[in-house]
Regions:
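Small-residue-enriched hydrophobic alpha-helices in membranes
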Residues: 1-154
Length: 154
């Protein structure tokens, strides 16, 4: 348990909020809106958060757990945040330096694979294939994270 608490302790409250918004920025990048989410997309996002909670990496799990613990409040707060997706994901990327290279890569993989790809596939054909638009949006978001994570092939 101490390892998980140690992850959060590395960040200020403002930095932690930025990390909590990471899944929201990835979701927004795929669905193309910052607020007033389509309820079907939002339900998929919630399922992807649940799946992400089992991802490897203590930081990712702790961030996702904290998001799920106050999802409604964070959703409202995210809707009022003025940062763009690009600025937000860039800030997430910069903050991950504090977590170490391995933990940072696991966090980025969680954002891209569990959240981004999860939402994109659910929105696509048969709930399994990403549309070309969603795949392009996801690729751009992954680049904003300076991610070394590769998108899974359809």
């Amino acid at each position: 348990m101490g390892g998980l608490l140690g992850q959060r302790d590395r960040f200020t409250q403002e930095e932690w909020r930025t990390l909590q918004f990471g899944p929201f920025w990835m979701f927004s990048a795929v669905v193309g809106t910052y607020n007033r989410f389509d309820q079907r997309d939002y339900r998929v996002f919630m399922r992807c958060l649940e799946a992400a909670a089992t991802s490897p990496g203590g930081l990712g799990r702790e961030v996702v757990d904290s998001v799920m613990a106050d999802l409604d409040g964070l959703t409202r707060e995210y809707g009022r945040d003025t940062r763009t997706i690009g600025v937000g994901l860039g800030q997430v990327n910069a903050l991950l330096d504090k977590a170490g290279e391995g933990e940072a890569l696991r966090f980025k993989d969680m954002l891209v694979s569990a959240i981004g790809e999860g939402v994109a596939r659910a929105r696509g054909r048969y709930g399994e294939e990403m549309s070309e638009d969603d795949a392009n949006s996801l690729a751009l978001a992954a680049q904003l994270l300076s991610s070394d994570v590769e998108l899974a092939a359809d």
